Amino acid sequence: MNLSRKLNAPASFIYNKLIESSIHDINASINRGLSPDEIKGFKYEKTFLSGHKATIHIVDVVENELYQFKTTTSIREFVTTYKIKELSSNQCEVTCTETIESHGPMLKYNDMLTGAVLGWSKRKQLKKVLDAMAATYK
């Protein structure tokens, strides 16, 4: 999946929203406080509402420019990257990419089919999330 979106908010604001969300998720999973400076390279286990578990690894962070994490389950590995480009003092462009690597040929085939069918839905949802973040900027 690949999506680029111009937002009416500074790059620093959107970056901080992404990091705050990540820190909230991490702190809920490990039951202790973690600062933004500590998240690069951090790994933790997350249990989803469905009961499935995944290991989340914060791969890279570059202040106001990049946030990348890897989600690993028993059958798939997702790498999600948010690149933030400052366009002006009150506008930025966010490019989100997600790659999926499945373990096994049948899963890879299934991912190709479902990705083609459901990819638009995922992009639509991501647009809503990014727009909601930008809407909180004043």
Regions found by a protein language model. Name each.
Residues M1-E38:
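Hydrophobic ligand-binding cavity/cleft-lining segments
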